[in-house]
């Protein structure tokens, strides 16, 4: 199977035409704009109609899609298990599983990166390949539409792919139908831009900024998506804003390592939020990788840390068990 990658750094972020995605662009929402169910998309409309009865109507949208919650009135009892309010990860609505914010295997880091695929990620992915390191990549649907070949590379390299919504907005701000669209159109674009070559359909997602409540969880659950959060935040995505400096980010990486060496993860592992957002976040990940590798017993994709050997809908693609990784037989 031939998969084309851009190796020339000067060409990596030059827009290109890729027929399988370009010819279907009219069947998706406008890239980087909040998604809604398209008026002519009878398949999406039928899917929404089939699940809307399971979505709570008593949980209302909160704030704006850019994260302004100033005018939100919300009970201190946190009735909706709203992560942005108090980092709740145990749903209060029956029938929903807890968010994944840690992993059961001791001494283990569920290794992953948000906001890809980044058009300039070849050096980063080359580095991961050189270390025989796989990770979980949380991909934005609009990015996949913009950079389909880069998305292909992740699957070809053996990384796990999860959904990170269509437009990367605060999910609890949307109506239920629009929140459905943010996830629904992300799953198909991952299929259509990647499945043509690799045939994978994700079964996991991460809400941008962690913004999720039981209404959004119910929508994700109805689409077969498991919610993955994190326990530690590198704040690499905030570097250079407010009081967050590159020194802050380095200190956050070091704190994670210190917690590992002090025994914090002796009974269960953890997940740290890091990003494929830009050259800084990827370079920082490479800078700290040797120290993470030395400190943690295992750095593995989140699916492997959860012993999930079938990370996709398709059953012809499988991951190793954690025990296989423990025996250095991962890949």
Positions of the model-derived regions?
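Terminal accessory/targeting
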Residues: 1-110, 131, 135, 267-331
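Active-site beta->alpha N-cap acidic-glycine motif
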Residues: 47, 52-173, 178, 182-203, ...
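Acidic-and-aromatic substrate-binding clefts and catalytic sites of carbohydrate-active enzymes
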Residues: 116-120, 139-148, 169-177, 205-214, ...
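Short coil/turn segments at secondary-structure boundaries
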Residues: 123-126, 232-233, 286
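Short, surface-exposed basic-aromatic patches at helix termini and helix-loop junctions that form
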Residues: 128-130, 152-156, 219-224, 289-294
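Alpha-helical scaffold elements lining the catalytic groove of polysaccharide deacetylases
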Residues: 156, 169-197, 211-267
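Residues at the C-termini of beta-strands that transition into short coil/loop
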Residues: 165, 231-233, 303-305
């Amino acid at each position: 199977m031939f998969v084309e990658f851009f190796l020339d750094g000067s060409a990596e972020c030059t827009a290109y035409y890729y027929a399988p995605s370009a010819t279907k662009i009219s069947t998706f929402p406008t890239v980087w704009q909040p998604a809604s169910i398209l008026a002519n998309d009878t398949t999406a409309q039928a899917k929404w109609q089939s699940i809307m009865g399971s979505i709570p109507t008593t949980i209302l949208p909160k704030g704006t899609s850019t994260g302004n919650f100033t005018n939100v009135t919300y009970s201190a009892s946190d009735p909706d298990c709203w992560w942005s309010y108090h980092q709740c990860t145990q749903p209060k609505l029956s029938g929903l599983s807890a968010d994944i914010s840690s992993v059961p295997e001791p001494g283990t880091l569920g290794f992953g990166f948000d906001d890809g695929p980044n058009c300039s990620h070849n050096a980063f992915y080359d580095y991961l390949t050189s270390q025989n390191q796989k990770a979980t990549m949380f991909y934005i649907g609009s990015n996949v539409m913009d950079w389909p070949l880069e998305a292909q590379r992740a699957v070809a390299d053996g990384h796990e792919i999860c959904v990170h919504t269509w437009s990367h907005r605060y999910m609890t701000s949307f109506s239920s139908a629009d929140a459905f669209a943010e996830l629904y159109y992300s799953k198909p674009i991952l299929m259509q831009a990647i499945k043509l070559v690799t045939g994978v359909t994700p079964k996991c997602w991460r809400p941008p900024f962690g913004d999720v409540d039981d209404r959004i969880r119910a929508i994700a659950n109805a689409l077969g998506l498991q919610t993955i959060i994190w326990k530690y935040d590198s704040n690499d995505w905030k570097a250079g804003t407010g009081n967050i400096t590159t020194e802050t980010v380095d200190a956050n990486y070091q704190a994670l390592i210190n917690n590992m060496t002090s025994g914090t993860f002796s009974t269960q592992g953890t997940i740290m939020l890091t990003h494929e957002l830009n050259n800084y976040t990827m370079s920082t990940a490479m800078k700290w990788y040797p120290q993470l590798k030395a400190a943690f017993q295992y750095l593995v994709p989140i699916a492997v840390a959860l012993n999930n050997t079938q990370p996709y809908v398709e059953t012809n693609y499988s991951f190793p068990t954690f025990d296989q990784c423990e025996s250095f037989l991962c890949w």
